[in-house]
């Protein structure tokens, strides 16, 4: 049900009145206002807030995501939203950060390739997608690849501590150019990767070739016991 209110003569406070001037009478009219329960619920999900001003037209917009009552707060993130392929594999997806499990790295790889396929404009021309590291969990062995450009065999140390694969490298290089400017390069790798239980830790093999470290870990043979159950 709507509420009806009768409006009579109204004078706007914004309009100035000169002394002696008369205000013309306005005939009464009817205005209907819906009750609060009749107002539709607004399903707003995204609200854009943009800074004002007379300066240059830079895009300072911020995406504000309104969360339902069940959520615990409001998520705010600056646009454009970056996907996992935009984040450097040596940043948030750093495989060299301490103590990662092999399952985490496999999940990260899946997420990278899914984003590259589903996001429009990615991988235009059918180019190859290559991340600086890769893990393949095969039937009889686990194979790993880590790109380590500029690193020699003497700079890399691979070891297994209990169930953890440890890869360390500290490479420094300094060259003097013909233009009297010295060139320095420094790379440091340090990772601890927890291995699954079905690995033969004593038979881990590592090879460094053309700046790429290849690691092969054989899997243990699982003996399956088959027991025939007699049906009565």
Curated annotation (Swiss-Prot):
Keywords assigned: Chloroplast, Plastid, Stress response, Transit peptide
Transit peptide as recorded in UniProt: 1-46
sHSP domain boundaries: 124-232
GO CC aspect terms: chloroplast
InterPro entries to which the protein is assigned, alphabetical: A-crystallin/Hsp20_dom, HSP20-like_chaperone, HSP21-like
CDD domains: ACD_sHsps-like
Name of the protein: Small heat shock protein, chloroplastic
Biased composition (Polar residues): 1-25
Gene3D superfamilies: 2.60.40.790
PROSITE patterns in the record: SHSP
One Gene Ontology term from the biological process aspect of the record: response to heat
Region named Disordered: 1-35, 48-81
Annotated SUPFAM superfamilies: HSP20-like chaperones
Subcellular location, record wording: Plastid, Chloroplast
One Pfam family, short name: HSP20
Comp. bias (Basic and acidic residues): 55-78
Family affiliation: Belongs to the small heat shock protein (HSP20) family.
């Amino acid at each position: 049900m709507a509420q009806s209110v009768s409006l009579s003569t109204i004078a706007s406070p914004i309009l100035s009145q000169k002394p002696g001037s008369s205000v013309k009478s306005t005939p009464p009219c009817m205005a209907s206002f819906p009750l609060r329960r009749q107002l539709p619920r607004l399903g707003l999900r995204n609200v854009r807030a943009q800074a004002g001003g007379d300066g240059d037209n830079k895009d300072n917009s911020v995406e504000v995501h309104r969360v339902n009552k069940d959520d615990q707060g409001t998520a705010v993130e600056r646009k454009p939203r970056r996907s996992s392929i935009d984040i450097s594999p040596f940043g948030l997806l750093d495989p060299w950060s301490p103590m990662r499990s092999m399952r985490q790295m496999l999940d990260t790889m899946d997420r990278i390739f899914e984003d590259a396929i589903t996001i429009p404009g990615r991988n235009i021309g059918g180019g190859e997608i290559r991340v600086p590291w890769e893990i393949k969990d095969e039937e009889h062995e686990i194979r790993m690849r880590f790109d380590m450009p500029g690193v020699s065999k003497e700079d890399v140390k691979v070891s297994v501590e209990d169930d953890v694969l440890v890869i360390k490298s500290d490479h420094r290089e300094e060259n003097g150019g013909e233009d009297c400017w010295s060139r320095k390069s420094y790379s440091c790798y340090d990772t601890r990767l927890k291995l699954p239980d079905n690995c033969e830790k004593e038979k881990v093999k590592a090879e460094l070739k053309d700046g790429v470290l290849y690691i092969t870990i054989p899997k243990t043979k699982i003996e399956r016991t088959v027991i025939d159950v007699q049906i009565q």
